[in-house]
């Protein structure tokens, strides 16, 4: 595939917690940052240790700045050039995904990838030339129980729809997308949205995220008439969890089922993309994968941060996370710079500014710098002239001159004053509108860092130290490889048959160990598959309960003929991921709104409403006594459902 590049995958291991130490759990995961390797060891002697290699590995003592500069900085740099970029944190619940993405606000060194990206973006803008104009917009959403919610909206519990257009791609309809002028405003919006996000306590995490969150930064830039648009998606996924460990019940259990289902779909998408033989990628099976469609196998530069815990009692979940991460390394994306995109707002604002300036120029031609002063001077001249006329008029009135000329002058004076007031008001509106739009656009070279200047400096210093250490590491690695090559050459020179036999024995032992590892790998895959099947069965049992409850409610409260009517006129929409009603304009509520009020058909002292009154009034339904409990169609459907569920 031309221009394709693989998804970058990094692994971060959190420190072992005090609770885990008190419970006697040991460390099962060791990280080698230099070799970019993660080693996981089981308590069972039968299972050999596993080693996985990634694009970068962060041990428990790695600081937030290093994580940002290694994993996130290259993505943000590309977004500023006009590419799409995605950074998402994946892993078991309680492994530090939210800390990696958001971190703590204070001290500055503890901030995560999202706030650090704010400082990076505006530091870049401040260093650009004055001939480059920027427009920065943000959005913040969560996917809670398969419902998309706008975290920046006052009504953050509303369910939004996913739409798709050929010129724009996948987007969320009616999602708030405010413009920002500095990093402080971005930080304030992130904090506001984070407060609206769904969190809850479980046995594994007191502040467990109960939803997937997606913070998106859209950066448009214009230089020499060319508009580019980069989109940065920062995703904090909810963690996979087992009910036996989290102790989730009731609402928490329902949330966990939805989270596991969407993460299972994400795993299926990754598997299908890596397989290469799959003709269908199941993006539409969940709203999460639908929104990540470009990030996985599409037009985006993507980094996956796999978060793991070090304790032995999380061995199975950690191994599963590492397997998914190892598989994701083979996903290929084809990223391209977005030039003159259809949904760019920067061009629209520039045209609006030109139109407003043209109107202001017509009012008072001249240079932009002196235009406002000249207009104000002109207004003052008119006011002085009017003041002179007012004095003359007052003298005429005081001298008791009350002829037609005086009335004409009074009328003219009032019209001039109204005209002057209107001109000043319209000018102020135009000027205010122009300033408001210009404020949204950011000119390169302006210092917009404000309070985050210290943060930007820390990132820059850390990045320079990182580059220097990489250079030294590369130099040392070259020396090590040279010495290793010499050593291998010496070892391969057999001085006797005994040495040759010794080397052959080593090779046999190596192959034997590889065979042992392969068998253990197969065993782990079988166990992992069994765990996935058990998790799916748990989800099916939970969904079965909800389904039976809904069926019981329908049987008890909705007449059968109306159920059949509903079934006849509904169809499943793959695009919306929901049931759609045909001819919705002719449904009861819409028709009732335009119909005259219905006559009252009953009268009793206690004002109770008979059961199914609304159905009889609107559609002439049969009474409960003469209505059969079930129809043949529904009866057959119930039998099929019972067979499926049992």
UniProtKB/Swiss-Prot annotation:
Which Pfam family would be a valid example here?
Kinesin
GO biological process terms on file: anterograde axonal transport; cilium assembly; intraciliary anterograde transport; microtubule-based movement
Provide the protein's localization.
Cell projection, Cilium; Cytoplasm, Cytoskeleton
Q: Summarize where ATP binds, as residue positions.
A: 91-98
Q: What is its main location?
A: other
Cite the residue spans of the region called Disordered. 623-646
* One cellular component (GO) term of this entry: axonemal heterotrimeric kinesin-II complex
Which terms does the record give in the GO molecular function aspect? Answer: ATP binding; ATP hydrolysis activity; microtubule binding; microtubule motor activity
| Entry similarity comment | Belongs to the TRAFAC class myosin-kinesin ATPase superfamily. Kinesin family. Kinesin II subfamily.
Subunit structure and binding partners: Component of the kinesin II motor complex, a heterotrimeric complex composed of kap-1, klp-11 and klp-20. Interacts (via C-terminus) with klp-11 (via C-terminus) to form a heterodimer. Furthermore, within the heterodimer, the C-termini of klp-20 and klp-11 interact to form a coiled coil (stalk) or tail domain, and this is necessary for association with kap-1, and kinesin II motor complex activity upon IFT cargo binding. Prior to cargo binding, the klp-11/klp-20 heterodimer is autoinhibited by the tail domain of the heterodimer, which folds onto the kinesin motor domain.
What is the protein name stated in its UniProt record?
Kinesin-like protein klp-20
Q: Which species does the entry assign this protein to?
A: Caenorhabditis elegans
| Lineage start | Eukaryota, Metazoa, Ecdysozoa, Nematoda, Chromadorea
